[in-house]
Structure formats: C-alpha cells, structure tokens
UniProtKB/Swiss-Prot annotation:
Catalyzed reaction equations: (4aS,6R)-4a-hydroxy-L-erythro-5,6,7,8-tetrahydrobiopterin = (6R)-L-erythro-6,7-dihydrobiopterin + H2O
Function, as annotated: Involved in tetrahydrobiopterin biosynthesis. Seems to both prevent the formation of 7-pterins and accelerate the formation of quinonoid-BH2. Regulates the dimerization of homeodomain protein HNF-1-alpha and enhances its transcriptional activity.
Protein name listed in UniProt: Pterin-4-alpha-carbinolamine dehydratase 2
GO MF terms, alphabetically ordered: 4-alpha-hydroxytetrahydrobiopterin dehydratase activity
Length: 103
C-alpha cells in the first residue's frame, strides 16, 4: 500500500481539513469522511465532471461514493480499506475541486 493511503497525522489532518473546508468540503458527522455538493448548469456539465473524476479515481484506484441527479453531484470521500480519511482522499478532493473549476 502506498504512503498516500496512510492515515494523516494529527497536524496534517488539522491543516488539510482547514484547507478543504475553505473550498466547501465538510466533515461527515457519521463517519471519518469528507463531503461536498457540486451544482452545474446542466446534466451534460455534471456528467462531464463525473467522467473526469471517474478517470482520475480509476487511475488512483480510489473511488468516491457519489450521487447524481440532473445537474447536482454529491461526493463523499473515505478510504474504506483504512476505515477513514487518508492522504488519498485529500489528493482526490483536490483533483475534484480543480475538475469542477474547469467546467
């Protein structure tokens, strides 16, 4: 398992959560995960965004939990194999934010 799949240190966790919250992510109240909702102009934009994220997720072998209705995409990130938030989630969240900004 790569070092990116490992738990965050307490200091890393504090800093990355501040950064992620500043960009609209929130902590899941029920699990050690992060969540964000994205709204696009239409279904085509939402699906294009999801396609970009899916390709990156497959490349990382780290797949989001997500839900899509028309122009809305809801994403939860958690490392199931580790039982919580890891560096992989942070890296994918950062990619997701960049992908959403480019739509």
């Amino acid at each position: 398992m790569s070092s990116q799949s490992h738990w965050l240190t307490a200091e890393e966790r504090t800093q990355v959560l501040l950064d992620l919250k500043a960009s609209g992510w929130s902590e899941s109240g029920e699990r050690d995960a992060i969540y964000k909702e994205f709204n696009f102009k239409n279904f085509n934009q939402a699906f294009g965004f999801m396609t970009r994220v899916a390709l990156q997720a497959e490349n990382m072998n780290h797949h989001p939990e997500w839900f899509n209705v028309y122009s809305k995409v809801q994403i939860t990130l958690i490392s199931h194999d580790c039982g919580g938030l890891t560096k992989r989630d942070v890296k994918l969240a950062q990619f997701i934010d960049k992908a959403a900004a480019s739509v």
